[in-house]
């Protein structure tokens, strides 16, 4: 694992060096992100590297879960000609937005079936549209659904066992998702239940079916 990370670093370094040699680095956009949070399995010593940071005290909240520790990741973008060095944004985005952003970069109209939202305005320091909500699901850990809507984060776990309860967290006050406030926000839960049904479609591949939702 350490060798893969080191090799990636070396290759990206070689690429950026070559871009500088041919005077194209200033005109090149490079994006980095991750598909999930840190893992706690096998070769990764997440405790030693503190790679899970604030989520390190709970292995249920890292890779494989839809808690913040499993899905909240940083994104780094460099584009010297356009992006101010050292700039920072709290814009909430998703990997689905990368395709929409690239289309926007090339001024290509986004197809109607693409749900991603371009974050190019954020990169350029302009006014940015925001998602009404972001939705996730996975059949790991007995099936999970999650939703981010403004300050609210909702998660339903153990769907395959018949669980229908939705946990709700106010991320402005509770980033670690320790305090379930669903019982005191039933109106929000009702709205989320509707979105959980509207946002999903049956997966094309049966390998991604969730017991209790698809069979």
What are these regions (language model features)?
Residues 1-7:
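The substrate-binding groove and active-site-proximal loops of carbohydrate-active enzymes
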Residues 7-46:
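Metal-dependent active-site segment of extracytoplasmic phospho-/sulfohydrolases and closely related
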Residues 17, 21, 27, 43-44, ...:
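Secreted, luminal/periplasmic, and some membrane-associated catalytic domains
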Residues 24-30, 72-73, 128-132, 149-152, ...:
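Loop/turn elements at helix/coil->beta-strand transitions in domains of secreted/extracellular proteins
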Residues 38-66, 83-87, 91-171, 205:
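C-terminal cap/loop subdomain of S1 sulfatases and analogous C-terminal strand-loop tails that border
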Residues 174:
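Intrinsically disordered, low-complexity polar regions and short flexible loop motifs
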Residues 179-187:
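Active-site-proximal N-terminal segment of extracellular/periplasmic enzymes that hydrolyze or transfer
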Residues 198-210:
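Bilobed periplasmic-binding protein-like "clamshell/Venus-flytrap" ligand-binding domains
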